[in-house]
């Protein structure tokens, strides 16, 4: 896809990561039409190893010692073209995802974010295939005010949306304030609400474009689902609802 950069944030390069990353990059190659760029960001010692394995004229690297996901993305977008997408190393694209985005953009070019229908896998039992979908709710009759679009009213009461794999307009991502580092666990939820609050549009393309892995130990979903109490989870949700009206990260240290 022209003017699209795929960001791959990575924190380590152990045997498990190498196996999962190869799977992720293979999916990128199948989806790529030769125009998409690939950008790895991670600590210096990790990037040095990645460089040995993944090379090419459309591949670049950023060495950054801060392994905070939000920081990595915020730094990487400064090196992106008109659009960017995020590929987590334990996830995969479907082969026609970028092609489908381009087709929908031909008739619907007003959205700031194009999300895919996302299949969900459990890390333990990946071989069993998807257990369900996310992002599909906006295509249900009467769910949102405009079929296929996410709206703020719905998002404040329903938060089961996955953003990785989506295609973002880089300038709009910057204009609404990027990701907030202080939002430790619900940063994507807060970002989606902030995007809509600032008058931008989020559209879900009714095509499966991404397969997302849940509950890999150490992942955000694992932390959220397996280690947080109900009170802590509620705290982060409510904090997101209070912070989305502020464009800039207010640099608070939130504690549940």
Annotate the PLM regions.
Residues 23-35:
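Short, acidic, metal-binding catalytic loop of nucleotide-sugar glycosyltransferases
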Residues 82-92:
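Short beta-strand-to-loop acidic/aromatic patch adjacent to the donor-nucleotide binding site
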Residues 117, 203-209:
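Catalytic beta-strand/loop signature of glycosyltransferases that borders the donor
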Residues 117, 134-158:
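Short, flexible, basic/aromatic active-site loop/helix in glycosyltransferases
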Residues 184-191:
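Acidic donor-binding loop at a coil-to-helix junction in glycosyltransferase catalytic cores
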């Amino acid at each position: 896809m022209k003017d699209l950069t795929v960001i791959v944030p990575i924190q380590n390069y152990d045997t498990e990561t190498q196996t999962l990353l190869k799977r992720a990059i293979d999916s990128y190659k199948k989806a790529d039409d030769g125009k998409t760029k690939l950008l790895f960001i991670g600590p210096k010692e990790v990037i040095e190893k990645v460089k040995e394995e993944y090379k090419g004229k459309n591949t670049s690297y950023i060495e950054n010692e801060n392994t905070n996901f939000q920081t990595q993305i915020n730094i990487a977008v400064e090196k992106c073209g008109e659009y960017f997408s995020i590929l987590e190393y334990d996830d995969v694209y479907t082969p026609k995802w970028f092609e489908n985005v381009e087709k929908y953009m031909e008739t619907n070019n007003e959205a700031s974010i194009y999300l895919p229908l996302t299949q969900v896998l459990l890390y333990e039992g990946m071989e069993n295939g998807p257990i369900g979908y996310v992002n599909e709710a906006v295509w249900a009759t009467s769910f949102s005010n405009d079929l296929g679009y996410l709206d703020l009213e719905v998002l404040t009461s329903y938060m089961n949306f996955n953003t990785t794999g989506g295609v973002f307009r880089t300038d709009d991502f910057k204009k609404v304030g990027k990701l907030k580092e202080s939002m430790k666990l619900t940063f994507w939820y807060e970002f989606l609400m902030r995007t809509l609050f600032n008058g931008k549009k989020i559209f879900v393309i009714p095509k499966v474009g991404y397969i997302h892995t849940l509950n890999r130990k150490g992942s955000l979903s694992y932390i959220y689902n397996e280690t947080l109490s109900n009170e802590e989870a509620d705290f982060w949700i409510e904090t997101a609802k209070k912070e989305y009206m502020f464009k800039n990260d207010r640099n608070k240290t939130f504690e549940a």
